[in-house]
Structures are given as structure tokens and as C-alpha cells.
Amino acid sequence: MRKALSPEKLQGVYGHIAKRYDFQHALITASADQKGRRILVEHSVSEGDEVLDCGSGTGTTGIMAAKKVGPSGKVTLFDLSEDMLSIAREKVVQENVQERVTFQTGDMVHLPFGDNSFDVVLSTYSLCPLYDPVKGAAELYRVTKAGGRLGVGHSTEPQNVIVKYLADRVEDIAWHFPWLSMGCRSINVLPALENLGGKVLLSKHIGVPLWPFLIFVIEKPRTEQSHQLGR
């Protein structure tokens, strides 16, 4: 796994690309990013849920969730970049879900929420740039309620050896241009979440061959079985 960009560098990168992020990410991923968001929301969110979209960026996933939770639900959009959340605020108003959405900035590795706070926690493509994605994933699990669901989408390595070699070479070039790579790299956090006690309900690879995503949904057991990673 490549060394992550610093949080300060990430803030600068995402501040720089905020206005074109949706277009750029969809173009690079051939719109597989949207497919992943839809699948995760479909398999995680129910009417009336209280949802955290962590690393929400411009709010695309959170808005999908806000539409599904209905008037009785709530969605918190949480992101490191105020510039990205500024775009999210505009989109939330355009989609007329502002009454059920709140916004907060902060670091995903140190979430300012108590244990078991949300019925559903979502993270779409936001763990990949973190300096400690395993700890970030553990934080997502911590704030998910017992019996709740955690839905994650992140970059993963191609399963074909030749394709992986080609992807690594392309990534070598992209990594020299943070505005292009967006600090994203392949990670692997599902084993750590299973180790905490999470039950896998869905696990699926999607996306283009060079830049595949792993999307998964886990359920946090109602009776705590977790081994509290790093705590």
C-alpha cells in the first residue's frame, strides 16, 4: 500500500478539485462509483434510519440515503474538506432534502461521535486516501449501532496479475499528480472489520479492470462480540 498524503495535503487537493470532483471521479471510474453508491444504499438504508455518510465529499451518497430514509430519518454528511461540503450543501438544497441533512467537518480517524450512534454508516471511496484506513474503518464500526449496518466502497487491487502490473504502472504516473490520483490507493479493511465481529452481508467487486472497487455491507452484532481493534 502506498504511503498516504497528509491530511493537510488532502484538504488542499480536495479543495482544489471540489467543483469538478463529481465529473472527474465518474470519468475515471466509468461511472462505477455511482453503481457502488446505489448498491450500498439499497442494501443498507431503510426508512427512518439515522445515517452517517463519512467522508461524504460532495454528498452524492448521502443524498441517496436522505431520499431513502424519508422525512422521519436523518443523515449527517461528514468530511475533512469544507470545500467539498460546500458543494454538498448546494446539491442537498437542489434535491430538496435539506430538512433531514446536517453537515460536519473532521477527521475520519478520530470521529467526534459516541459509540453506537448511527443505524447506518456509509463510506464510499473515502477510506482509500486515509493515512490509517484500518483505524478509520474501526471508527466507522465503533459509531455503528449494535444491529446496524456499515456499507463501504473502496479501491482494491485487480485480481488478474497482468492487469495488476499495468494498473501499478499507471498509478505510478498518476501518483505524481495528486489532483488526478486524489490520494486514492488500494486498501484492505474488511478482514479487520470481521475481526471486530462484523458479519458480512454483501461483498462484491465492481468497476473497470484497472481500477476495481470492493463494495461490502456488514452488520454489527446486537450482542457485542468485537475485539475492539487498537483500543
Set out the residue ranges of the language-model regions.
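A short SAM/SAH-binding and catalytic strip from SAM-dependent methyltransferases
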Residues: 120-132
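A short acidic, Gly/Pro-enriched loop at the edge of an enzyme's catalytic core
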Residues: 109-120
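A short glycine-rich, Lys/Arg-flanked "PGG" loop and its adjoining helix->strand segment in the class I
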Residues: 134-146
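C-terminal alpha-helical "lid/dimerization" subdomain adjacent to the S-adenosyl-L-methionine
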Residues: 8, 24, 153-207
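Class I SAM-dependent methyltransferase SAM/SAH-binding core
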Residues: 52-110
